[in-house]
Structure formats: structure tokens, C-alpha cells
């Protein structure tokens, strides 16, 4: 398929490509994405400015980088690590750093520096100073788990709505799923009692959110809503679900914007409303 035709003939791939590009730190985008027609207008995407989108003069113990080739062991390496294969990683510093691992070129890696303190002469580091930095390649989740950083998002493609559940990476799946629709219950109706407003009128047959969760799924539809996606899904159809019973595919069926006025809300607007509305609920688990 010609690059120019992807947005029209394979819109899922186009969206996957653009969203992955937007999440990637600017200093490694060229190495990982190169030139592509999908990204021709990527400069119009609002800057996400996430914690891992570090500027060259910003220090953080964690950084994202891209491998660029093999390296000699650091002169500060112990006898154990000296025998390992080393790799150069470009991570937005003046010169590449070294990690004691063999990693193929042009692979994205998360780096953890040995110290939280800025190196001497920061940010004007020499090549020798960069090579002397003690760095390890770690799991992308480490920055979040150890320091509480929001370290970006991942983009996963699914062949259908039901496949979102079937191909879920979590062994136990999602604890709770929310389908969004203008025909759903209010967000207040599903909040736990401790977070719900006193004026809430409990809706019959509406399941409340659990007090805690490991993995929460929120599903947003397109212009026509989620009903057509459920009705055309082979897995859901085999269970007898239709447009009229689409809400049964989720634990909760919620209208995020009561009295919206406009007949249609853009999906990207609904995402903002939904995440903002659920923030207090998510935060309550960490207080």
C-alpha cells in the first residue's frame, strides 16, 4: 500500500502510527520513525510534554533512549560487567551513554542512572563524562513504580471490540469496564459512595465502581457511538448482543456529559471529559 493511501485505506494503522509518534520523546523520534507520509502534519499535534519528554538541560534519573551500536566496556566497570557486551544509547545528552547489555541497534530503551544527582558540569558534559555515567537499561514501568512518574502510554491494536478483552496483556484481564454513551447513567451514579455527591439519586440496576482496581477499561465510541461496534462484533453477536443491548457488553454504561447540548461530542473531547471525571476516583486509591 502506498504511504499516501494509509490514512484512508488503513485508518487504524494511521492512528496507531500517529499516537505512537506523539508519545515518543522528541530526541529519539527521527531514529525510530524516520520520514513517513503519516507524519507529514505531525507538527500540528499539541505537545504532550510528558515527564519523559526531557529537554537537553533537564536532569532526571530516568531517560528514554535509542540504541545505536556496540560499545567498549566502561573503564569504571567491575570485573563482572567488564566481560559483558556493552551498547551505546542515544538519550538526549551531548554524547551517547553506555549500558552493560547487548541490544540490537534502533531499539527504544528506558535508562536508569545510578544517582539522582546531576553529574558534575551538568548540562555541559564532555564525551568522557557521558561515557563514564553509570547507567542500566530497565523496564519502562520502573520510573512509574519506583518514583511515581507518568512515563507515557502504549498503543495496542485490536481486530475488534471484543478482541480488546481477548488479547489483553493482563493475565486476569480488566477488573471493570465502562462503556460510554449519551444513553447511559450519570457518572455520579457509578461512583463509590464515599466519592458520590450527597444529592445523588441511585439508579436502579446500575453497578458501582469497585473501591479499588488493578486495570480499568474505558471505551469510547465514534460518531455513531459504541452500539454499532458491539452489534457488528462476531463475538458479541454470537452472545445475542444487538444495538439495543450493547450496554450488556460492559460493567457500566455511562454518559460522561449530562445535558451536553450539542448532539455530538468528538471522541477526543469525550476522552478528556472521561479521564477528568474519573480522576478523583483513581486518586482515592492512593490516599
Please report, for each region that a protein language model flagged, where it lies by residue.
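Post-transcriptional modification and biogenesis factors for structured RNAs
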Residues: 1-287
Amino acid at each position: 500500500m502506498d504511504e499516501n493511501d494509509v490514512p484512508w485505506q488503513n485508518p487504524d494503522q494511521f492512528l496507531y502510527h500517529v499516537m505512537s509518534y506523539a508519545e515518543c520523546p522528541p530526541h529519539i523520534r527521527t531514529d525510530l520513525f524516520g520520514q513517513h507520509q503519516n507524519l507529514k502534519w505531525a507538527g500540528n499535534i499539541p505537545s504532550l510534554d510528558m515527564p519523559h519528554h526531557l529537554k537537553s538541560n533537564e536532569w532526571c534519573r530516568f531517560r528514554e533512549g535509542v540504541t545505536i551500536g556496540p560499545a567498549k566496556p566502561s573503564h569504571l566497570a567491575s570485573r563482572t560487567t567488564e566481560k559483558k557486551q556493552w551498547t551505546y544509547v542515544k538519550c538526549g545528552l551531548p554524547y551517547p551513554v553506555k549500558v552493560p547489555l547487548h541490544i540490537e541497534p534502533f531499539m527504544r530503551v528506558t535508562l536508569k542512572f545510578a544517582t539522582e544527582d546531576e553529574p558534575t558540569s551538568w548540562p555541559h558534559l564532555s564525551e568522557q563524562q557521558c561515557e563514564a555515567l553509570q547507567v542500566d537499561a530497565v523496564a519502562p514501568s520502573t520510573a512509574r513504580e519506583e518514583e511515581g512518574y507518568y512515563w507515557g502510554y502504549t498503543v495496542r491494536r485490536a481486530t475488534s471490540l471484543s478482541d480488546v478483552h481477548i488479547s489483553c496483556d493482563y493475565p486476569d484481564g480488566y477488573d471493570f469496564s465502562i462503556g460510554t454513551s449519551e444513553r447511559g447513567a450519570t457518572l455520579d451514579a457509578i461512583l463509590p459512595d464515599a466519592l458520590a455527591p450527597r444529592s445523588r439519586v441511585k439508579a436502579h440496576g446500575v453497578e458501582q465502581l469497585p473501591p479499588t482496581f488493578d486495570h480499568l477499561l474505558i471505551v469510547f465510541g465514534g460518531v455513531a457511538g459504541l452500539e454499532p461496534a458491539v452489534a457488528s462484533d462476531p463475538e458479541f453477536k454470537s452472545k445475542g448482543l444487538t444495538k439495543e443491548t450493547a450496554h450488556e457488553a460492559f460493567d457500566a454504561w455511562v454518559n460522561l456529559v449530562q445535558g451536553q447540548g450539542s448532539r455530538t461530542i468528538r471522541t477526543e473531547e469525550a476522552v478528556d471529559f472521561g479521564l477528568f471525571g474519573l480522576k478523583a476516583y483513581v486518586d482515592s486509591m492512593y490516599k
